[in-house]
Amino acid sequence: MASRTKRNIWRSKRLIIRPVETSDDDFLQSIYGESSDGYQNATSIVPVPQGTASAKAYRAYLEKCLIGCIICLPPPTTPEDESKPTAPGTTSDSPPKKPAPTPIGAISLSAADANVSHHRNTMVGIHIAPAYQGQGYGSEAVLWALEWAFRHANMHRVEIGAFGYNEGAWKLYERLGFVHEGRKREAMWYDGDYHDLVLLGMLKKEWQEKYGAVKHDGKSA
């Protein structure tokens, strides 16, 4: 059997994936509260101001998922960091205090009830803070979630949904390899009109074919 290259599964090219903490409540509140459009693109519930109770409820939901995590950017590093003088009261052997990663969003894979878990299906949920949208972080996080689902959690199928008016989202998911599986016609009320709910999915074999995943024999697909 060919050996596999060990790597940190909680890192992608530009992102760090970390657990949800109680200290994230303010951040979780902000990613929905900063933009009403972002809130309505991420949830179908009637728009209401998001307070601390909503943030705690969202954190509780993430903690109950198959996996629910905070998406972060790593702290910046510069050559100057390596040459900074030792702070008073420390020795040259003392590790400098590193800045914390910057949270930019949340991602989850839904957990199935025990009596239907044998189907090995899950759904992606993702939200990127408005200031970090349009930079490819959402795509990178979804690709990370797909790899985790298929390679580590042995999922058979991953689905994702988007509201019909959010054309940029569902077209992006199609480019990532999700297959357009159907629409729930006029299922969503938004801004004075009814809109479709677009349903997309990806099978494990489709992911392997598109992304050259590592199979059980340790070789690339």
Which residues fall in each region the model found?
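Conserved active-site tyrosine of GNAT-family acetyltransferases
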Residues: Y173, F178, L200
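Acetyl-CoA-dependent GNAT
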Residues: S44-Q133, L203-K205, G218-A221
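Conserved beta-strand-loop-alpha-helix junction that forms the acyl-donor binding cleft
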Residues: A129, I160-W170, A187-Y190
